[in-house]
Amino acid sequence: MSPVRPRFYTPREVSRHCIVSDLWVSYLGRVYDLSPLLELHKGDVLLKPIIEAAGRDISHWFNPKTGDVKTHIDPQTGCLKYYTPQGRFLHTAPSFPCSGWDNDFGRPWWKESTYQIGILSSKTKFIRIINTLTSQEQALEVCSEETIREILGRYLPYNGHAGSYTWKFCGLPLDMDKTLQENGVWDEDEEFEELKIASDLYTPSIHLYFNDDLTEL
């Protein structure tokens, strides 16, 4: 049995989850739902920096090589300590020895894989999906790593019968298990940037042709 493919998220999707009861963050290329953590430690003042960062990327908190919180030499004590200019947060030690510091919490939250829900896309793009049967058009932000089948999943809220259509680009059927790039839908953003042309002036269009089999997903 092949492993389950992780889901990809756009920064915009992460940013929508920005309240205490529904709090996501991203760091080091992964997306995390920290809502259970906040519920578990409800009322703890050390949650404040995490709550303030809700819906955002906090990769700058961490050392990309170790995956741990960044460290520095404390100028007052000369000791190595966590670098937390945003304020000390949950599971980081206090600056000075403290009898009330309980480090018997096991794995720190930033290394707890159970909070991970997916991968942050390295590049997103807007496409237009045009239903040739109804002439309806939908703009959709997608992840460059997603296959057409996964993009279909994003489109389902707008068309519950999306699986009953043949998906085409420039008149050619798309391979549903390949990405846009692998299907020849090239990302020209870099070329547009070199030419100083706004990338949103061109949005690739995917055309859907009804198969008349009433497939329901």
Swiss-Prot record:
InterPro entries assigned: Cyt_B5-like_heme/steroid-bd (IPR001199), Cyt_B5-like_heme/steroid_sf (IPR036400), Cytochrome_b5_domain (IPR052320)
Major site of localization recorded for this protein: cytoplasm
Amino acids binding heme: H41, H72
Coiled-coil portions: none
Top-rank lineage group of the source organism: Eukaryota
One Pfam entry name: Cyt-b5
GO MF entries: metal ion binding
GO biological process, alphabetically ordered: regulation of cilium beat frequency
Keywords recorded for this protein, A-Z: Cell projection, Cytoplasm, Cytoskeleton, Heme, Iron, Metal-binding
Cytochrome b5 heme-binding domain boundaries: 6-72
Recorded GO CC terms: cell projection; cytoplasm; cytoskeleton
Location(s) in or outside the cell: Cytoplasm, Cytoskeleton, Cilium axoneme
Family statement drawn from the similarity comment of this UniProt entry: Belongs to the cytochrome b5 family.
Function summary: Radial spoke stalk protein that binds heme under oxidizing conditions. Required for the coordinated beating of multiple cilia maybe by functioning in a redox signaling pathway.
Designated name of the protein: Cytochrome b5 domain-containing protein 1
Gene that this polypeptide is encoded by: cyb5d1
